[in-house]
């Protein structure tokens, strides 16, 4: 899950970024509306977490711009403006959810997951594939009664492959889905994660297509 965080307050932004990353999400952090516009024009996101009180372009103006370009990416507004009138105004402008400051990070994470599930037409975070049951929130895979623990990166990679089953994904595409702007990436990071998943889940789950990328085949 790739999230665009738009927040100008360094302290709040850092805390939210850390919390979302710890929950297994990939986060790009824009500190103003213009920077967020550029990000949205160049990168596909599963969710936008948006503060309304931004420099250069207000959060309300950015939200209006997002919807006018027919971008249906879910938007969660977080703001200190938490009167009923403010909430109604934000939702009417196109926000999908509204969270007043201060807030609990666990609630923010839960709301983020719920918005993405809803946008993808899913009622639960868990993903079934063959005899596997993947739980991105708990970073686990169940095979029958066996519980297999994954790192947050391994889980995010597996979810990306399962969401695109039958379609090969390049190493660059997988890197984009797993790493934010400011994160350093080892040149062989994807290969290492793929190797770990094969060791934990079986060598046949993920197929390498030389010169193209990796794929999890559709179930037959």
Language-model segments: which ranges?
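CheY-like receiver
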Residues: 119-138
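A general structural signal marking secondary-structure boundaries and capping sites
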Residues: 70, 119-123, 165, 182, ...
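Glycine-rich nucleotide-binding loop
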Residues: 35, 211-215
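Conserved hydrophobic "DFG−1" position in protein kinase catalytic cores
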Residues: 100, 134-136, 141-143, 216-218
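N-terminal/domain-start alpha-helical segments
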Residues: 1-123
């Amino acid at each position: 899950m790739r999230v665009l965080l738009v927040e100008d307050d360094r302290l709040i932004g850092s805390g939210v970024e850390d919390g979302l990353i710890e929950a297994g999400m990939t986060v790009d952090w824009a500190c103003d509306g213009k920077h967020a516009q550029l990000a949205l024009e160049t990168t596909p996101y599963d969710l936008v977490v948006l503060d309304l009180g931004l420099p250069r372009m207000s959060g309300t103006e950015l939200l209006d711009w997002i919807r006018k370009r027919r971008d249906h990416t879910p938007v969660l507004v977080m703001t200190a403006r938490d009167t009923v009138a403010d909430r109604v105004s934000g939702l009417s402008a196109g926000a999908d959810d509204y969270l007043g400051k201060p807030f609990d990070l666990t609630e923010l994470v839960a709301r983020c997951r719920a918005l993405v599930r809803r946008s993808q037409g899913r009622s639960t975070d868990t993903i079934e594939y063959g005899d596997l049951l993947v739980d991105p929130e708990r970073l686990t895979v169940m095979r029958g009664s066996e519980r297999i623990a994954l790192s947050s990166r391994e889980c995010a990679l597996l979810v990306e492959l399962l969401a695109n089953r039958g379609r090969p994904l390049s190493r660059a595409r997988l890197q984009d889905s797993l790493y934010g702007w400011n994160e350093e990436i080892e040149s062989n990071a994807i290969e290492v994660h793929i190797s770990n998943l094969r060791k934990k889940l079986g060598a046949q789950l993920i197929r390498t297509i030389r010169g193209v990328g990796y794929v999890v085949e559709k179930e037959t």
